[in-house]
């Protein structure tokens, strides 16, 4: 019984897992798309709160918006390129170009409002 519960929890968690970007896939993943990238660190408590909000937003977000994550400790070059110095930070990309950065925890309504104003 414990194994079944564990497997169910893993499958639910994987539904909400966002793909991690790195130097190898970064450009191809953001090119020609509306993208929100969550710059985070595993040691950052507010980043975990924002991740939960992003999971909630992912359920209601438009199909033309994709959410990715970048661990700042694993990807220092990308982090530096986009001037990320505070966490959590969301960078909104349109057609491969960074168009806006938001710092801090955002509610689902704020995420939705920001995406609508940027991508519509």
Predicted regions and their residues:
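A short beta-strand-turn-helix
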Residues: 18-33
